Each structure stands twice: as C-alpha cells, then as structure tokens.
Amino acid sequence: MTASIRPVTPLQAAHLRGTPAILDLEASGFGRQSYPIEVGYVLPDGSSYCSLIRPAPHWTHWDPAAEKVHHIQRDMLDRHGNDIGDIARLLNERLRGLTVFSDGWAHDYPWLQALYEEAGLVPSFKLDSLRSLLTEREERDWEATRELVSRDMKGQRHRASADARMLQSTLVRLRGGASPAYT
C-alpha cells in the first residue's frame, strides 16, 4: 500500500503560521426561524470574499431590529443576493481543509448549517470559535483592542467581510503583529 502525501497549499501554509481565517455571517434575526443573509470571510493572506444570500422561498422570518444593525433590507437580498448552492460551493472550494473561526460561533454555526442544508451540501472546512485561539491575557484585552482596531477602520460598514477583517486584525494586534490592510 502506497501512502500519498498531499502538498500544502500557500493558503494552508499561511493558516498554519498562525493568522487565522475568519468567517462572519449576518442574519435575518435571531432564533430558530432566522437564516443567513450575508456571508463574508478574510483569509490568512488577507484576501476576502463577501456575498449577499438570496433567501430560500421558505425563509420568511425578518427582524427589523437586525436590519437596523446590518442595514441590509430584505428586497436587497432578492435583487442582489447570490444563489445558496453557488455560495456553498464557492465556500467549499476556497475554504477546503481549513479551520475557519467565528466570534459568534453559537449563532454562526446554525446559520452556516442552514445554508449548507438548503444547498444539499456538506462544508469542506471546519468552523470553530475564535475564543479557542485566545490566551487568558488576549481574552482580557480583546474588547479594548477591538475598539482600537474598530476606530482605525472607521468608515467600514457593519457587514460580514468587514467584520471578519476587524476580528482578524484584532487578533493580530493582540499578538503584537501589524494588522493587515483595511481594504
């Protein structure tokens, strides 16, 4: 029996060096009836992706309070959202084999599962809690550092990829590194 060794891609190498891939989701609200309306990520190399999600016909829950936070209107999703299956396939292609981190894992995980269930696919990557990366000191200093990074990124909209970049930059700054560019 011959064992095959798969080469590590440049993206996987950057991931292994410590800058994590971060994923964020915006949703129609909170609770069992809510669903993802936007997904965004930033990779260890700084590249990012963001897409509005066209809701499935049976995804009807809409919370005006959530809209006030993310400023995404329901009709924007119908006009500009991408197909659920296309988004799931793209995420699988680009994130394959990575562990991707989220600051709101308890919410983001069910929303990501709803996306994949609707697409009839299984994620090719693992979603984990950003907290699992933090030392006690980093946890203690997280909020103050996030506020500094947020101020530096002034003018960034509250959207999935911008939030993911802010989270990644916060972690990098906590660890004494230069934050990636905010573009």
Task: List where the protein language model places each region.
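Acidic, Mg2+-coordinating catalytic module of metal-dependent nucleases/exonucleases
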Residues: 99-106, 110-116, 145-183
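Substrate-binding/catalytic groove segments of enzymes
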Residues: 122-123, 140, 178
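Active-site-proximal helix-loop-helix substrate-binding element of RNase H-like nuclease domains
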Residues: 58-77, 128-168
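A short alpha->loop->secondary-structure connector
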Residues: 116-127
